[in-house]
A protein has these predicted regions:
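Anion-binding alpha/beta catalytic cores of soluble intermediary-metabolism enzymes, centered on
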Residues: 1-47, 51-234, 239-243, 248-298
Length: 298
């Protein structure tokens, strides 16, 4: 079981080397991350984008493009389509976003002709290495689904569980976190949490243990759980935090990064291959970890 993000680099190296297809690769932070991943032996890369800019960035930043295939395409919409096409044709295993809008890339991924549209919902899964926590902490969904209903949360959980399984966490503990840890008919998030827990107990959601509603405090602190008299397999030992909406996930994730000094990695799940998105605000390590995470999952 992977307990620290730095361990996923070695895990990725032990697995079969994958090929990453980068859409609109003419972006300095993305090129730096991809070159580092190639140097580390995690991936080979296909760069789709403005070749002149790609080569110029590499020269200015002393980046070794080595044997990477570069496909010259200045139009970002066409670059996204070509990057996706490489995966559809089996020439690459997964996709990374470069210098283009997320919606542009996902439109290409979900194009019916591309063949990468999955059967379910796209959701964002972040993995945090928090110094104050005893293992990796997964957070979902703070990036894709604004206000998920119960049926959406089932798919969001399943997507996160797939990521946990890829990191050799066999039976991840899922905490649907809410403002309170009791079912309140006036608070939909608590009703959804209770339903998810019951569905898990009856085998409708497999591969994990779900217990909720739980407050954030008792989801990650056994002392807080004991103080409130909560007896739970998940309390104080959560692997996956399921947030009620995108705002909660966004705020919590950024709090872990900026106040908790956490390092992170993230992917979009739900298509036939993972999609790696990195923020300009991410550290170089986080970008590298995201590429490694995508390689392990794909």
């Amino acid at each position: 079981m992977v307990k620290k993000l730095e361990e996923i680099l070695e895990l990725a190296k032990k697995r079969e080397k994958k090929v990453i297809s980068v859409a609109a690769a003419h972006d300095k932070p993305v090129l730096e991350a991809v070159c580092e991943a190639v140097k580390f032996g995690i991936v080979d890369a296909i760069l789709v984008g403005d070749k002149e800019k790609i080569v110029s960035i590499a020269k200015d930043e002393d980046l070794d493009l080595g044997n990477m295939e570069i496909i010259d395409e200045k139009d970002v919409v066409k670059a996204a389509a070509k990057a996706v096409e490489f995966v559809s044709q089996g020439k690459a295993h997964y996709i990374m976003k470069g210098l283009l809008g997320t919606s542009t890339l996902l439109k290409a991924v979900l194009n019916k002709d591309a063949g990468l549209r999955g059967k379910g919902l796209l959701s964002h899964v972040m993995v945090y290495d928090v110094p104050a926590y005893h293992k990796l902490l997964f957070l979902t969904d703070g990036g894709m689904v604004p206000y998920p209903e119960l049926k959406d949360k089932i798919e969001i959980v399943n997507n996160a569980v797939k990521v946990a399984h890829a990191l050799d966490i066999e039976n991840p503990k899922v905490a649907p976190i809410c403002a309170v840890e009791v079912v309140n008919p006036s608070m939909q998030a608590t009703l959804d949490a209770s339903a998810l827990s019951q569905m898990n107990k009856r085998g409708q959601i497999k591969g994990c243990i779900i217990d909720g509603p739980l407050g954030l405090d008792n989801a990650v602190s056994i002392e807080a759980a004991k103080h409130k008299g909560i007896v739970s397999e998940v309390a104080g030992d959560s692997d996956i935090l399921l947030v009620p909406n995108i705002e909660a996930g966004n705020f919590l994730g950024k709090s872990l990064t900026y106040f908790g000094n956490a390092v992170n990695a993230g992917v979009i799940m739900g298509a036939k291959c993972p999609v790696v998105l990195v923020s300009r605000a991410d550290t170089a390590k986080s970008k590298l970890y995201s590429i490694a995470l995508g390689a392990i999952i794909s």
